[in-house]
Amino acid sequence: MPSSTSNSEAAGSDAAATAATQAAQANAELASGAVGVPLTAPGSPLPGPGAGEHFVRPGFVRQTASDRPGVAQPVPVRDIPVQPWGLILLATVVMTALLIGGWEAYWRAYGATPGYRNSNGEWAEQRRRIDAGEGGKTVLIGSSRVLFDVQLPVWERITGERPIQLALQGTSSVLALEDLADDPKFTGHLLVGVAPELFFSGRAIRADVFPYYHKQGPSQRSGNWLSKHLLEPVFAFYDPDFALGTVVRRQPWPMRAGMHKNSDVRKLLVQDADRNSHMWRKVEEDPAYRAIARSIWLEHFGKPPPTMDTPQKLQKVIDTQIDRAVAAVAKLRARGVQVLFLRPPSIGPYYAFEQHVFPRATTWDVLLRRTGVPGIHFEDYPQLQGYDQPEWSHLSASEANRFTAALVPIIKADYWVSTAAPEVPPR
C-alpha cells in the first residue's frame, strides 16, 4: 500500500510538472509573437472536468482581470498592414468627386439649377428679423400660394418696402398668426394668406418650424450659414426632392391591397436668399412634369381623414380654426397691427375641390365676420383673375409678377394706411 500511494503521488507530480512545462512553453511562444492571445499563467487552475486539472489552449484562453487581481489589462495592439495609403486616399477622393459630379450633371440636365433651400433654418433667419429691430415691417404669412404668388421685388418697387416672407407650403397660416400674436416686438402690417384646404382644416406639414425657431441653437445657426453660403449657391442637386432616398421612395413600388396612393408633392418652386420664391420653370415648360404635379393634387382630393369624414366633424374643425384666428387677431389688433386676409386664386379641379369641401359662405365669409378683419378675395376683383396656373394652384413666375402688381395697389388704396416711400423705379 505505501508503495502504491507513493507511485500515485509521483505520477501526479509528473503530470503537474508536464502541465507547467507546457504552459511555460506556450507563454514563451506568446512572448516571441508566435501566439497572438494571452494565455493563463503556468500551472494556473482552470475550470474543467476534474478538480485541480491544468490545461493550456493556445490561441483560445485569454487572461482576464479576474485572473490577475490588481494588475491592469494590457493595451490591445493591432498591426496596421502596409498599404499604399496615399494612393488609396487619392482614389477615394477621385471616386467621390466623380460620383458627385455625375449626380450634379444628371440633375442639371433634368432642369435643376442651384438655389436656396426652403428649410427651417432659412425661415428662422427671416423670422429673427422681427426680433432684431424690424418688427414694424410688413410681414407675409400663409401657405404656398403667398410664397409663389406675392413677389417681393414687385412689392418693393411699388411701395419702397420689401416685406418679410414667412409663408410655409402645406401649412395653415393660423400657426404663424398665433406665433406673431404672442410676439410683442411685431407691430407692423400683416398679410395673411388663406388657402381654404389648409387654413380651415388646420393641416400643417411644416409645424415643426415654430419650435425649431424658438429653440434654435448656435450649431444649427452655423450649419444653416455654411449650407447657405457654401453649398446651396453651388450644387443643383442639393435639394430635398433630388436626394437619393427621396428618389428611391417615389419609385412605382407595388402597393398592398386596400392601400391608396399618397405621393409627396414634387419640387415646384425656386427660392432666393430672402425666401422670395417663384414657380420652377420645369412645371411651366415640361408637360410631363406638369402632369405629375397635377396627378399628385388629384390624389389629395380623395377620401377625407377620419376627423372630417362627416359634415358635423368637418364643421367642428372649421369652427376650431376660426376660433384660433379670432383669438390671435384680437391680440395683434390690440397693439396696433393692421391685419388683412388674402384669398389667392386657384382654378380647375383644385378650385372645384375647395368649393365643394370648404365653400366660401361657411369659411371665408365667417372668418371675416368673426375676426372683424377685412379681406381680399380674388373672386371680388377682376384684376386678380384670369392668370396662368400650370398645376391649378400656383401662378407661373411671370404671372406672379403681374398678380403682385395688381394686388399691391388694392391694398394701398383700400385697406392699409401707407407710410412707405413712393414708388421707385425698378433697378
At which residue positions do the language-model features occur?
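Secreted/periplasmic serine-hydrolase-like ester/acetyl group-modifying domain
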Residues: V209-R335, V424-R427
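N-terminal Lys/Arg-rich, disordered targeting/topogenic segments
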Residues: M1-W85
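Hydrophobic membrane-insertion alpha-helices, especially the h-region
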Residues: L87-R108
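C-terminal regions of proteins
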Residues: Q355-R427
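Membrane-embedded segments
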Residues: I141, R145-H229
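Active-site segments of SGNH/GDSL-like serine hydrolases
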Residues: A328-E354
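Loop/turn elements at helix/coil->beta-strand transitions in domains of secreted/extracellular proteins
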Residues: G135-G136, E161-R162, F186-H189, A334-L340, ...
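Alpha-helical transmembrane signal-anchor/signal-peptide segments
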Residues: R108-R128
